Amino acid sequence: MDIRFEKRPVLKEKPDQKNLGFGKYMTDYMFVMDWTKEDGWKDARIVPEGPITMDPACVTLHYAQETFEGMKAYRTAEGKIQLFRPEMNAKRMINSNARLCMPEFPVDMFVEAVEALVKVEADWVPSEPNTSLYIRPFMFATEAALGVHMASSYKFMIICCPVGAYYAAGLNPVKILVEDELVRAVKGGTGFTKCGGNYAGSILGQVKAEKLGYAQVLWLDGEHRKYVEEVGTMNIMFKIAGEIYTAPIEGTVLPGVTRDSMIHLLRDWGYKVNETRLSVDDLMKAGHDGTLEEVFGTGTAAVISPVGELRYKDDVVTVNNFEIGELTQKLYDTLTGIQWGRIPDKYGWTVEVK
């Protein structure tokens, strides 16, 4: 792919790596590429990061025809920069786009675009412990025309921002509230995609949980309001009587890259992983009879989020004495070890940016 480069006259001042937060500081450049019915994908370019212009009638602003991804670049102790399973993000975006009638952005072009931008932004990949460069590929319709329809033009972009440790105070268990009225996804819908509408629709549940003193909301299935699916914007796993349970990928749950990686590790360590429906009643029962040993969310931003308390209606259970479980800690240490190059990658998950 021929990528045009437009140099920024003055580079931005880089933030203090010890106070990065999440999503606050954008890097110097962004990747942009356009698609039209007539020409397909064209004009790949890396240009100075900054505002973009949109027509008020732009399809995306009215009908939400957009998708996005989330991934990271990591700097190893030796100074190398590496990505983590970027092809999985590319394939997931293809599936998201297909559901929203958006054009396919090929896997090889996706990975090449990410690598090209990260290479240009190498100085922005932080070196402080547990920091990384967050990468946000996204695509949206650019046609200016009202009326619900498949747009005739689209734009694919990538922006980046250095981020600190997701947990500034360390990896600590959180309290989550089971949401039994609102739903995140239904079969036949867009629950398996990474589109903005899914996240906009989840905000009310999050706000309700926070008002009651809970950090996240645990979503139930949209049909029966019975089976556990996701927690906040993360996949979730339960260790019950020595076995792992997590919701199956059946159209309502996002096929997480971290989720898939955790399942690989768990099975490699000899754990039985049940990708099956788990009812909230059985979950709470396990919490009360002592067989619920650990609960943790999984996702790119936090990697793993241990759960110390579950509330369903007026029923409350404490998980593992509100302490981080041994398996939760091992999963976190192993996966982050691979991502930052502290542990040999025997799975072939990391890709060095040269």
Model-identified regions with their sequence ranges:
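Conserved catalytic-core subdomain
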Residues: 1-17, 25-27, 168, 176, ...
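Extended Lys/Arg-rich, glycine-bearing segments that form polyanion-binding/interaction patches
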Residues: 16-19, 86-90, 94-212, 327
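Intrinsically disordered, low-complexity, positively charged segments
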Residues: 1-55, 61
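Active-site-adjacent loop/helix segments that line or gate small-molecule/cofactor pockets in enzymes
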Residues: 24-32, 37, 46, 59, ...
